[in-house]
Amino acid sequence: MNQAVSERQFAPHLSLDVEGITVASTNLDNVFNARKIPSSDGSCIFGSLNLPEYQRPYRWSEEQLARLLDDLRGFFSTDAPGHDFYLGSIILHQQGGDGRERGILNIIDGQQRITSLALLHCLQKGDKGAPALEFNSPESYRRIQHNLRWLEQQKLPRIDFSRINVTLVVTRREDDAYRFFETQNTSGVRLGGADIIKAYHLRSVIPATQNDFARTWERLGDLKPLVATLMKSRHWQSLRWRNVASDRDPLLERKQIVTELAERTLANTADIAYRPLQVHRDAWGKDMHSVQPGYAMRQPLGSGVNTMRYVAYFHGLRQTLLDVGEAPPKGSFAYYYKRLSKDACGSVFLSRAYECALLMYASQFGTARLLEVSLWMFRVIFSMRLIREVSVREDGVQAHIRDNPLMDWIASSHSEDELLEYLRSYKYTPTGAGLDKHSIKKRFVESVSITLHLNLPWPNPIRVAAEYDAELCAAIKRISLADIARQGGK
């Protein structure tokens, strides 16, 4: 039986000064069948469940399903208790509809539980009485098919959906719906920063194209590494330096991502790319313009299409540039990137900074002289491994980039030659501490030495440290000249 309840009783975490929020207690059978449900403010919640475009994919694992099944088996046994099974709260955004006409109930929080119970409903009772949810994400389709196969192999309880109680928290304002989506985590699948910025920007896309943009976003896959790189490029600026939150502090990390890539974006729908323009004038004064395609990593972003295409562009650039495979051609940029940044194991934190610098360079200058520039940038970034005795900490890497503003050198340079002047003039003093034992530092130097054919005076750690940088610079010059020769002297 439906009953109206108070906000304070069932939703104490919500701000009660927000208008347009209503609460109701009902059962899942009523929700699935889109029946009229009386709410706390005297109105009716009346609508069909729907997954809005900004929802993240269905991701519940077998382990999470198993926990739900155990709870349901324990409740729907022969000695079932007299009270109903409480599923928790579901946050919905009601679009249209009133006491007479059925509207749409967009699921803001509770998708994982609702979808899982809908699968159980289909296995037990078929499609009749189950919500007609549409999933646009290929990941959701794959997970649903996998979970259905898994559920078919389990001993399922006989579920009475009219005895599954749920608290509905309903808002009729889209801004409140997004705010709840951003802050909720009751389903056991934590919202990542990429999930939230997707939700934020889809709201600014015209409705006719929302599904297309949502599908495009889902096809990008895991955006966490890319978003972390974008955050570094936008935070590591000398004029407005901000440390980037560690992924070991997911709440602060998420807050920073939402602030930078959602809330601080400009309230317009113009898709603007800020690019440097080169004007070439011939002897007769005729101009020829040259513009690098794509977006600038640090550019201002507009809400909606602009930010979504910005992210998609850098996702594609990252794949093209840094997904180098297991055996890239020897002597290529991909070969040295893999050998020096991945295989040498200098530090995951240094590798992430290196990835940021490479993407910033490629977005500004393209791939011209990429190998040469990448090796000099490697020298600047990974010099920290030679400066430190053993450990390279995440906060230490941020301090290293702040003291040696590589990202600013890239962003402010007008040409590859100007950037190379910054890179070549960088000075540091390696230390031999840690090179006399089987340490990460020693293994890194040995790996770099093998890859670049450095002539180092092992096993003397003091001399190795003293001669390392000169050998490294000579190797970079030798490899760069060979690369220029391969390209016909260009």
What is each PLM-predicted segment?
Residues M1-K490:
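Flexible coil/loop and intrinsically disordered segments
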